[in-house]
């Protein structure tokens, strides 16, 4: 056991990297806001599409759920 610590002959595998994998740099606040805005715009566009094709069914479904 002591020899394993001194000489490094323990259970370490040869294919293990010595350094951790690189991580992506943190995203800036402006980039995060832009990505969130794009997601919101996509969702609103989808809602508009549903309303254009079948507004009556959308309203009935909304009223049946109690308007919540």
Swiss-Prot record:
Keywords: Isopeptide bond, Ubl conjugation pathway. Residues 1-37 are annotated as: Disordered. Residues 24-62 are annotated as: ARC ATPase binding. Is modified by deamidation of its C-terminal glutamine to glutamate by the deamidase Dop, a prerequisite to the subsequent pupylation process. GO terms for biological process: modification-dependent protein catabolic process; proteasomal protein catabolic process; protein pupylation. There is a cross-link at residue 68 (Isoglutamyl lysine isopeptide (Gln-Lys) (interchain with K-? in acceptor proteins)). It comes from the Bacteria. GO terms for molecular function: proteasome binding; protein tag activity. InterPro entries: Ubiquitin-like_Pup (IPR008515). The modification Deamidated glutamine is found at residue 68. Pfam families: Pup. Pathway: Protein degradation; proteasomal Pup-dependent pathway. Protein modifier that is covalently attached to lysine residues of substrate proteins, thereby targeting them for proteasomal degradation. The tagging system is termed pupylation. Belongs to the prokaryotic ubiquitin-like protein family. Strongly interacts with the proteasome-associated ATPase ARC through a hydrophobic interface; the interacting region of Pup lies in its C-terminal half. There is one Pup binding site per ARC hexamer ring. HAMAP family: Pup. The N-terminal unstructured half of Pup provides a signal required to initiate unfolding and degradation by the proteasome but is not needed for pupylation, while the C-terminal helical half of Pup interacts with ARC to target proteins to the proteasome. This is Prokaryotic ubiquitin-like protein Pup. It comes from Kocuria rhizophila (strain ATCC 9341 / DSM 348 / NBRC 103217 / DC2201).
